[in-house]
Regions:
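Peripheral interaction segments used for macromolecular assembly
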Residues: 1-67
């Protein structure tokens, strides 16, 4: 992972998602949240919902899961 962390508002479909060990687990299909009040609910990755509490870090182009 390179660079500084970015906001969940920057995440776009197609970004890579990796597990806590750095192994690729899929790509973002959709970002779940409410931009109006800046609440991040999670992601849809390869058709499966991942809750926000599982997201450890967001860097441009890549999201790392906590577990």
């Amino acid at each position: 992972m390179n660079g500084d962390p970015v906001s969940w508002l920057m995440v776009e479909p197609g970004w890579t998602v990796v597990n806590a060990h750095g192994k690729k687990v899929g790509k973002v299909d959709e970002v779940l949240g409410d931009e109006q009040v800046d609440i991040f609910h999670g992601l849809v990755v390869d058709g499966k919902e991942i809750l926000a509490e599982r997201v450890a870090d967001i860097h441009e182009g890549e999201i790392r899961l906590a577990r």
